[in-house]
Amino acid sequence: MRFAIPLGAACAWAGVALAALQIAEDFSSITLNNDRFKAVWSKSKGSVVDMFLDGQDLLGPQSGSTGIGPYLDCYCVPSGFYTAGATNPRMQYVEGTDSTGTKYAGVILNDTYTPTGQQFQQYWFLRDGETGLHMFSRLAYYNETTPFLRNLQEFRTLFRPNTQLWTHLTSSELQTAPLPSKNAVSKQVVVQDATWRFNNTPDDAYYTQFSEYFTKYTFSNQWRDNDVHGLYGDGTNSNGSTYGAWLVMNTKGPLHSDLTVDGIVYNYIVSNHHGEGTPNITNGFDRTFGPQFYLFNGGKGSTSSLQDLRSEAAKLADPSWNAEFYDSIAKHVVGYVPSSKRGSVDGRIKLPKGASNPIAILTVDGQYFQDNSVVPSSYQYWTDIDTSGRFRIDRVVEGKYRLTVYADGIFGDFVRDGVTVRAGKTTTVKEKWDAESAGKEIWRLGTPDKSSGEFRHGVARDPTHPLHPPEYLIYWGAYDWQSDFPKGIDYTIGSSDPATDFNTVHWSVFGPTPDNPNVEYNTTHDWKINFSLTKKQLRNSKKATLTIQLAGAKTASGNTDEYKASEPYINLIHESYINDQKEPLSFVIGFNQSSSCIVRSAVSCYQVRSRMEFPADWLKVGENTLTLHLPYNATDTETAILPATVYVQYDALRLELD
């Protein structure tokens, strides 16, 4: 192996042939190409600036930050955004043959942000016979003078084309649509941060088929469900040949969700749009993220459909895919852990009755699984559990982990700390999950599945457009609270329908929206749940327990986890009143538990829950009422064009008697 060295003035061009794989370098660029795929890196930009599949230009002309990529940027310097390579990009290439006998070549960007000393590395690798780029991204910070810098708020790579080649975008079967036309974009109306209305171009294909509104959040997706996302060209602008550009999510994910594609194909490595925690950048921070794979398929003469090209990409969404190759290039990638330092976990857990869709998660020992980032060096892994309770997770970096299991239909999680993984070994786990219980369940509202999607304007499909996207993905302002619930929420257990009579979000304030300038305060903040109890149910009962699980909540901190003493609702108090009791059952949603959830088209974000006990004699035979209360007209100061109201999104509620 060798690293490229700067070329002297007498040698302006050098090419190195590796059978079908070729490397070329001059003063301004490095080029990698094989029989079908070619990528060109600009040494001055630190990014891919040209890309071709079978001779077809995949990026289009460079214009500012478009027509380039994949490239690395972040929201991680004191001033905010930074694009790796913007200060002093130093580019080099590597080459070799992996353990399978396949030739490879790689390009490595090194850049240091001078004001703080933050070090960025971006790696791109091309293998012979493949039409895509394997990528790793690294950030390091060593600074004893300023040991705490800030949080790593966003860390992402972007494939950002500037061409009419691409005609459709897709992040799932439900989230597939034509790209809005240039005409629609030129006449769009801003309604919210990164959200537009196309009412001026009602004949546009996106409008007629998918939605009147477009936002990058519409195509966000949970990592657990996201194998692949990207762009498709249907041949309209490529002489009939079809093309695909995909980010293969070969590590998948549990509850984390974020942007996937909006004309840009994203790899969101670290982010907090939907309330996930982000790691702090402190002295000694040094993380390498990856691998991820950008695949480009179809090509000259291809007639493959979007679904066909997407399925081809999805077959690669497997953590074991190309493991031998990654081990071979580990010597080039600072911080990548090879297979020799990984082990496996083989488990079987007896699940509670009624559990469905169970998942096993390994995260940092001793912490709630959604708080994995509190230890910046931590790893996480997850896999679905089969119907017999068995699961296996391979390629786990050696160390000590917490095992968390959750399932649809079951309140609470199963947690076990101290699961130790050793390199080259298999750790066996055998457990029984006894579902939490505080007595006899009297009623439940909603399905405990860490989502508020079963309620109104959640996962229900939009009936007004032929592609029928789920309603929650569109834009919260497409719906009108006053029309849906003119008298507020007055729900009766046993007779009301959760899909229509209980909203997917409990607002303190609603509005205005594009079609309704009015702001509603009076019917939003108090919700009533009515239920009947019999003498038999109450007999000998001393204690009652109300469990409330939230799929997301927004306090005055939004999605930043930042404490602002000037904001009265930085910590949000949720209150529940039983019948005519003056004292509520209360729990606090902390500033560091807040999400920007429904306003960014999500029904599952950072989870918050509380189990509250109260005397059974607060209840009575016959009709009872539970009032769910948020502060009246509770708002914050928004710096972006977003609703200022606080809100919560219910996953499920349950009443038990003992």
Curated annotation (Swiss-Prot):
<keyword id="KW-0961">Cell wall biogenesis/degradation</keyword>
<keyword id="KW-0456">Lyase</keyword>
<feature type="glycosylation site" description="N-linked (GlcNAc...) asparagine">
    <location>
        <position position="239"/>
    </location>
</feature>
<feature type="glycosylation site" description="N-linked (GlcNAc...) asparagine">
    <location>
        <position position="522"/>
    </location>
</feature>
<dbReference type="InterPro" id="IPR013784">
    <property type="entry name" value="Carb-bd-like_fold"/>
</dbReference>
<dbReference type="GO" id="GO:0102210">
    <property type="term" value="F:rhamnogalacturonan endolyase activity"/>
</dbReference>
<feature type="glycosylation site" description="N-linked (GlcNAc...) asparagine">
    <location>
        <position position="110"/>
    </location>
</feature>
<dbReference type="GO" id="GO:0005576">
    <property type="term" value="C:extracellular region"/>
</dbReference>
<dbReference type="Pfam" id="PF14686">
    <property type="entry name" value="fn3_3"/>
</dbReference>
<dbReference type="GO" id="GO:0071555">
    <property type="term" value="P:cell wall organization"/>
</dbReference>
<dbReference type="GO" id="GO:0000272">
    <property type="term" value="P:polysaccharide catabolic process"/>
</dbReference>
<feature type="glycosylation site" description="N-linked (GlcNAc...) asparagine">
    <location>
        <position position="592"/>
    </location>
</feature>
<feature type="glycosylation site" description="N-linked (GlcNAc...) asparagine">
    <location>
        <position position="633"/>
    </location>
</feature>
<dbReference type="InterPro" id="IPR051850">
    <property type="entry name" value="Polysacch_Lyase_4"/>
</dbReference>
<dbReference type="InterPro" id="IPR029411">
    <property type="entry name" value="RG-lyase_III"/>
</dbReference>
<dbReference type="Pfam" id="PF14683">
    <property type="entry name" value="CBM-like"/>
</dbReference>
<feature type="glycosylation site" description="N-linked (GlcNAc...) asparagine">
    <location>
        <position position="530"/>
    </location>
</feature>
<dbReference type="InterPro" id="IPR008979">
    <property type="entry name" value="Galactose-bd-like_sf"/>
</dbReference>
<dbReference type="GO" id="GO:0030246">
    <property type="term" value="F:carbohydrate binding"/>
</dbReference>
<dbReference type="InterPro" id="IPR014718">
    <property type="entry name" value="GH-type_carb-bd"/>
</dbReference>
<keyword id="KW-0964">Secreted</keyword>
<keyword id="KW-0624">Polysaccharide degradation</keyword>
<comment type="similarity">
    <text>Belongs to the polysaccharide lyase 4 family.</text>
</comment>
<feature type="signal peptide">
    <location>
        <begin position="1"/>
        <end position="19"/>
    </location>
</feature>
<keyword id="KW-0732">Signal</keyword>
<protein>
    <recommendedName>
        <fullName>Probable rhamnogalacturonate lyase B</fullName>
        <ecNumber>4.2.2.23</ecNumber>
    </recommendedName>
</protein>
<comment type="function">
    <text>Pectinolytic enzymes consist of four classes of enzymes: pectin lyase, polygalacturonase, pectin methylesterase and rhamnogalacturonase. Degrades the rhamnogalacturonan I (RG-I) backbone of pectin.</text>
</comment>
<keyword id="KW-0325">Glycoprotein</keyword>
<dbReference type="InterPro" id="IPR029413">
    <property type="entry name" value="RG-lyase_II"/>
</dbReference>
<keyword id="KW-0119">Carbohydrate metabolism</keyword>
<dbReference type="InterPro" id="IPR011013">
    <property type="entry name" value="Gal_mutarotase_sf_dom"/>
</dbReference>
<feature type="glycosylation site" description="N-linked (GlcNAc...) asparagine">
    <location>
        <position position="280"/>
    </location>
</feature>
<feature type="glycosylation site" description="N-linked (GlcNAc...) asparagine">
    <location>
        <position position="143"/>
    </location>
</feature>
